[in-house]
Amino acid sequence: MRLHEYQAKQIFSKHGIRVARGELATSVEDVRGIAEELGGKVVLKSQVLVGGRGKAGGIKKAYSVEEAVEKAKEMFGSVLKGHIVEKIYVEEMIEVQREMYAGLTIDRANKGIAAILSSVGGMDIEEIAVKHPEKIARIAVNPKWGLWDYQIRELLLNSQMPREYWKEVASILKTLYRIMVHYEAELVEINPLVVTPDGLVAADARLNIDDSALFRHRDLEKLRDYTEADQMERIAMEKGLNYVKLDGNVGVLANGAGMAMATMDLIYIYGGKPANFLDIGGGASAEVVREAINLILSDKNVKVVFINIFGGITRCDEVAKGLKEALADVSTPVVVRLAGTNEEEGRKIMDEFAKDRPNFHIVETMEEGAEKAVKLAEEV
């Protein structure tokens, strides 16, 4: 779960990291009131969960209350990288003397945490790595032992960080690490971390929380912005389905994340593109299967659906019952592969169901199913 900038800054501030004064606005009148309170010179920041807001026109400076109001009128309701701007964070304009970068992220390759520091900032970390490789430092952190002082010194040296900022940057890195561990985050980032006459300030903030840890952080769960989620992904969340929308035309339904990803790989191998990732999990009932099918078919880009089930905890006959109910009036081509627990019973249900339905195809293997689905998608 990714938090908005204003939410992340509230958490950073709570833990002692300095941020500029600011408030959230949901209307032009809110912007007027906040701008007046902050003295007129403000920065208006669209609160949408995408990167590169500045380059896309989602961040604007205003040097008077009236200018802030006029720019807010332009921003509210505008579309920024596919997202409608409904909230603006109004922040006091600060004097920026230098921009830097500090962040921590999950390092899956090393099965730990990566601490990253750069003496330049204000751009994507990937861009920094290309343009200023000598000014970026990265170090692996073992969560068992934490972030040590000698590792921070190594980061400061290798990033060519001016010594006058060492003490403050070191303190911020330690705080970011505490935040990451406490909230079980996947990413904690300040970009840019700016130098001002009053010290270092987090001019932007990112905090991504591991969805699997949210049951231990009910206070953070309340911060989730469902209006920012894709409509279908939001529906999937509400129904407890693991769904990610993609840009292909072959709908995918599988039981288990590994099975779903393997199915998607096969679709790519045979020249197609999956329209989604959808894992119904283990032990899915007919009702869950029906909900999953309806979700896939609500995507207008889907030309064919490939259902790939290997029954373990999930029973093939239970899946077949759900498919029978969900697909009774569907004309979209459907390819089904059932194997595993109660496979014979499931196939009997499917064979009977497919008799008068030329759009329904039952296959023996994953490879056969993926190839068939891609071919059908090309023909539609």
From Swiss-Prot:
GO biological process assignments: succinyl-CoA metabolic process; tricarboxylic acid cycle
Binding site for Mg(2+): N191, D204
MF GO annotations: ATP binding; magnesium ion binding; succinate-CoA ligase (ADP-forming) activity; succinate-CoA ligase (GDP-forming) activity
EC number: 6.2.1.5
UniProt cofactor(s): Mg(2+)
Occurrences of domain ATP-grasp (ranges): 9-235
Reactions the enzyme catalyzes: succinate + ATP + CoA = succinyl-CoA + ADP + phosphate; GTP + succinate + CoA = succinyl-CoA + GDP + phosphate
GO CC annotation, single: succinate-CoA ligase complex
Pathway: Carbohydrate metabolism; tricarboxylic acid cycle; succinate from succinyl-CoA (ligase route): step 1/1
PANTHER family: SUCCINATE--COA LIGASE [GDP-FORMING] SUBUNIT BETA, MITOCHONDRIAL (PTHR11815:SF10), SUCCINYL-COA SYNTHETASE BETA CHAIN (PTHR11815)
Classification via NCBIfam families: PRK00696.1, sucCoAbeta
Record function comment: Succinyl-CoA synthetase functions in the citric acid cycle (TCA), coupling the hydrolysis of succinyl-CoA to the synthesis of either ATP or GTP and thus represents the only step of substrate-level phosphorylation in the TCA. The beta subunit provides nucleotide specificity of the enzyme and binds the substrate succinate, while the binding sites for coenzyme A and phosphate are found in the alpha subunit.
Subunit structure comment from the entry: Heterotetramer of two alpha and two beta subunits.
Protein name in the entry: Succinate--CoA ligase [ADP-forming] subunit beta 2
Species the sequence originates in: Archaeoglobus fulgidus (strain ATCC 49558 / DSM 4304 / JCM 9628 / NBRC 100126 / VC-16)
